[in-house]
């Protein structure tokens, strides 16, 4: 409501200023006419027609202070007539008033009017209602619900994750995939060297020649390393394998002699002067034939070695099985002979030992019994002799 009251005061001050400015403008206009009266030349040029004077609002018989009824509001701008109020009664203007009109029956507006009517000294004595008591009377659960309703809700909590494909961190999946080589009979790319592959092969091979590598073709000694690499490549004698990577971490391996060349290189850095290409091609053909022969001989030797190894392994297996069977038979016969000899020896040794031990024990026990009987008889005799001697002593 303070804004509404402020708008009222601003309206009144604005109207007063406008009236003051109006009167000041009129006075300045009159003073300007008095200070700068029109000259005779201006009047002659104007023609002195009554129509122009009446249209311009000038030249009347009445003095400046006593204007007629028709020209009483002649100097007022029509746009300012709505703001200029001669009666002093202010009316509501929807353009100037941005807010809603005041409601005299609203109790809150009446209270604000009363507070504004009070003096500056009575402002401190005005009792302001504390809303803390009203807040304490509220149910805390309702307050929490109101706060939660205003906050942003997470809609992912209520979704069923079993039927939703959530975006996971799959940045390391491609790195975990292992490279897979495509077999030679399933290669898909064209057997032609690309321009990039040619340049890469020439640069790498020239660098190897700079480091002291020996060329694989004759007749190029003393040339520039780039020319040596070019001649070796045209002869398809470069011992490189071109690896072509494909999507899905797959790759193909191509030998240089398997790839053709459709791109021509005419730079002087690579192409030697007055070089016999026919000899190189012939040498290349002979080298290829030799390689094929060597490969066939190698395969034959490998096959023969494999067959020999299989034969040797078969004989070894047979000999091992024979030795195992002989060993088992020997062990069986040995066990049988051992069992027989043990039984015989046990029976013989048992009878002998029993007879010997029996005779020895009997003889020993017999001799011992004889000795004991002799000792007993001797002791009896001694006792008899002692008795006789005693009696003899007494008899004496």
From Swiss-Prot:
The keyword Transcription applies. One of its GO terms (cellular component) is DNA-directed RNA polymerase complex. Gene3D superfamilies: 3.90.940.10. Keywords: DNA-directed RNA polymerase, Nucleotidyltransferase, Transcription, Transferase. DNA-dependent RNA polymerase catalyzes the transcription of DNA into RNA using the four ribonucleoside triphosphates as substrates. Belongs to the archaeal Rpo6/eukaryotic RPB6 RNA polymerase subunit family. This is DNA-directed RNA polymerase subunit 6. It comes from Acanthamoeba polyphaga mimivirus.
